[in-house]
Curated annotation (Swiss-Prot):
Transit peptide start-stop: 1-32
Compartments, as annotated in UniProt: Mitochondrion
Record's protein name: Elongation factor G, mitochondrial
Function: Mitochondrial GTPase that catalyzes the GTP-dependent ribosomal translocation step during translation elongation. During this step, the ribosome changes from the pre-translocational (PRE) to the post-translocational (POST) state as the newly formed A-site-bound peptidyl-tRNA and P-site-bound deacylated tRNA move to the P and E sites, respectively. Catalyzes the coordinated movement of the two tRNA molecules, the mRNA and conformational changes in the ribosome.
């Protein structure tokens, strides 16, 4: 098998693979030119859970010669898919961490990141899309657009990632690609257009017809190249109709193809393969259209044409505009466009950290310049310089050592102390990449080691997990002394508790899951507060006048200084600002963070001797409490968007279950004998739902959920939470 890293240089590098004692392969490499970048594709494979992402990646690796055998995600052989390298992934049949690999297709090279589909691990998708140039959005041919599909679409838009769609599982009963395309248009507002037509339905799926080449592809046993044939006679008219739709859709957003049609008597003359392919490529990279391909990864149908589509339609690193910020001038950031040039100063982004067999692995995307083993580079965010000890390319859990990597490449470094999202550059360069979006945790629980012997490893594990995953948070509750971990959901936290046991040999005791409640006000609340303390010697004095009201920036808090003149000097204003930050960390109602509050200081008074920063910080706490109580305070709870799929026969039971949990069904979709409910349910009422749904549907129902919004709790729950907090404080003060 030809290595990606050696072969990508047009055959100039000498292939020299040898098994080292440490289990890492070594590759001798020569330098490369910018021409090699145009043959490179960095793609992510993303989808809703169970749409077949990992199965598709397994086929891609097999057809490109990267692996010798195909293993299924939940295969009877117990091996599991190549990209699911964690024991937990193989046991649960889901992807938990994004996994990187690379392969060769024709004369082109593809870096692939297979991402999780479960919403609890959405940060893995977020950071993958942050560093990729293109993506394959995998859709289930039966279920179509699902909740996590919508989330992934939002993430792709956030990072301006062009994508192609692969409608998978067309061999399953009820599969309909045209329904899925219509959902892409209506639910995701994508200009989706089919490039293929399937031959056969469901279990009779034989292949696909390529609308660009107007050739049929029939797929045999796994590993065999598709047989290219003329279009079957019973498909000719339908193919003609779909090709017309394809050309007209592209022409509507591409002036070049539109002009060709005018000049060449369209539709009497159709664009040739070269003209149409170029137009699809232009509009895909510009994110004006989303090409749709079809097949069944499990049945080995449509995978090779998808690989062709990745090369034909998705951008190379030098075709995507990458912006960095020049921080060389203090307090002034200037946007600069990076170039995929190996001779330019090195710029790379650490997008993922992982505890490997040989220490911490730092995954790096190289945007500009060349990174070599032994180089001294700068961590712009931390202001530290480091020497690169080792460079590797990842193939799932396996590592292959390399001496250098160039622009567009994805690699990993050993033994580098940094955080996810840090930018590394050449020593004389001060560029930094823009940060990635990190969602706020929605659930917490208390955790402690079962025995004191495990304390050291417990602390080490928490520290490592925080570095690896920005959505995994750890804090110490000052009142109870408990360690509280927070994350994106039950499964997210469950996985980390299990990893602590397996990887660090620490048995833990966990408390009941805690919901991420928030506190806020519903109207303006005024304050006129004086803090005065005299106990001999210098006293304390601070007076503050102002108000608190709802913030105009949604859930964000704001501090506004409206003091005219020097009624409160600037040094004390800073103390008030710090005091406000203290107040919003722990609200006065139930001790949860405060959100959506604008705190305004309009006047005040000082004493020439007794006023101090401490006095004003204490006064802020009193002023905030006074305004908060006057502002009709309330508690907000997280509402989850829940999608439940089930056979129609269990409809009544499941609806009753949603109602019991105080949920609201906002949409119902019927597909054959199956139903999908879209609901909005308070997170506090979703605990244990997985077990209940299995019981109600005889194991045939499934659900997914993601955070939607925070909204006011009911009056009943409001009073209950206040009472519980009061009891807790009483117990702690005994």
């Amino acid at each position: 098998m030809t290595s990606f890293l050696t072969s990508r240089f047009g055959g100039l590098a000498l292939r020299n693979v040898m098994n080292n004692k440490n289990g890492i392969n070594s590759f001798g490499l020569r330098c490369f030119s910018t021409n090699s970048v145009s043959g490179l594709r960095n793609i992510g494979i993303s989808a809703h859970i169970d749409s077949g992402k990992t199965t598709l990646t397994e086929r891609i690796l097999y057809y490109t010669g990267r692996i010798k055998e195909i293993h299924e995600v939940r295969g009877k052989d117990g091996v599991g898919a190549k990209m699911d390298s964690m024991d937990l992934e193989r046991e649960k049949g889901i992807t938990i961490q994004s996994a990187a690999t690379y392969c060769k297709w024709g004369e082109n090279h593809i870096n692939i990141i297979d991402t999780p589909g479960h919403v609890d691990f959405t940060i893995e998708v977020e950071r993958a899309l942050r560093v990729l140039d293109g993506a394959v959005l995998v859709m289930c041919g039966v279920s179509g657009v699902q909740s996590q599909t919508i989330t992934v679409d939002r993430q792709m838009r956030r990072y301006n990632v062009p994508r192609v769609v692969f409608i998978n599982k067309l061999d399953r009963t009820g599969a309909n690609p045209w329904n899925v395309i219509e959902q892409l248009r209506k639910k995701l507002n994508l200009n989706a257009i089919a490039l293929q037509v399937p031959i056969g339905k469901e279990s009779n799926l034989e292949g696909v017809i390529d609308l660009v080449t107007e050739k049929a592809m029939i797929f045999g046993e796994k590993g065999t190249a598709p047989i290219i044939e003329e279009i079957p006679s019973n498909f000719v008219e339908f193919v003609k109709e779909k090709k017309m739709e394809l050309v007209e859709t592209i022409a509507n957003v591409d002036d070049e193809l539109g002009e060709w049609m005018i000049e060449n008597d369209f539709p009497n003359n159709m664009p040739d393969e070269k003209t149409l392919t170029a137009a699809i490529r232009r509009t895909t990279i510009a994110r004006k259209v989303v090409p749709v391909m079809m097949g069944s990864a499990f049945k080995n149908t449509g995978v090779q044409p998808l690989l062709d589509g990745v090369i034909k339609y998705l951008p190379s690193p030098n075709e995507k505009k990458i912006i960095a910020l020049d921080t060389s001038v203090k307090d002034k950031e200037t946007e600069v466009e990076l170039e995929s040039d190996p001779k330019k100063p090195f710029v790379g982004l650490a997008f993922k950290l992982e505890e490997g067999r040989f220490g911490q692995l730092t995954y790096m995307r190289v945007y500009q310049g060349t990174l070599k083993r032994g180089d001294t580079i700068k961590n712009v965010n931390l202001g530290k310089t480091i020497k690169v000890p080792r460079l590797v390319k990842m193939h799932a859990s396996e590592m292959e050592e390399v001496s250098e990597v160039g622009p567009g490449e994805i690699c990993a470094m050993f033994g580098v102390d940094c955080y996810s999202g840090n930018t590394f550059t050449h020593q004389n360069c001060s560029y930094t990449m823009t940060s990635m979006h990190v969602p706020e945790p929605v659930m917490s629980l208390s955790i402690q080691p079962k025995s004191k012997d495990g304390q050291a490893n417990f602390s080490k594990a928490l520290s490592k997990f925080q570095k690896e995953d920005p959505t995994f948070r750890v804090k110490s509750d000052q009142e109870s002394g408990q360690i509280i971990i927070s994350g994106m959901g039950e499964l997210h936290l469950e996985i980390y508790v299990e990893r602590m046991k397996r990887e660090y040999n620490v048995e833990t005791v966990t408390g009941k899951p805690l919901v991420a409640y928030r506190e806020t006000i519903q109207q303006r609340g005024d304050y006129n507060f004086t803090h005065r303390k005299q106990s001999g010697g210098q006293g304390q004095y601070a007076k503050m006048i102002g108000f608190a009201e709802q913030s105009e920036n949604g859930m964000e808090n704001e501090f506004v200084n409206d003091v005219i003149g020097t009624a409160i000097p600037p040094t004390f204003i800073e103390a008030i600002k710090k005091g406000f930050k203290d107040c919003i960390e722990k609200g006065p109602l139930i001790g949860h963070p405060v959100v959506g509050v604008k705190f305004v200081v309009s006047d005040g008074n000082t004493h020439s001797v007794d006023s101090s920063e401490l006095a004003f910080r204490i006064a802020t706490a009193g002023a905030f409490k006074e305004a908060f109580e006057d502002g009709e305070p309330t508690i907000l709870e997280p509402i989850m968007k829940v999608e439940i799929s089930l056979p129609q026969e269990f409809q009544g039971t499941v609806i009753s279950g949603v109602n019991r949990r105080k949920g609201a069904i906002v949409n119902t979709t019927t597909q054959g004998e199956s139903l999908t409910f879209e609901c909005e349910v308070p997170l506090n009422n979703m605990f244990g739902y997985s077990t209940e749904l299995r019981s109600m549907t005889q194991g045939k129902g499934e659900f997914s959920m993601e955070y939607l919004k925070h909204t006011n709790v009911s009056r009943e729950l409001y009073n209950q939470l206040l009472e519980e907090y009061k009891k807790k404080r009483t117990e702690e003060n005994k």
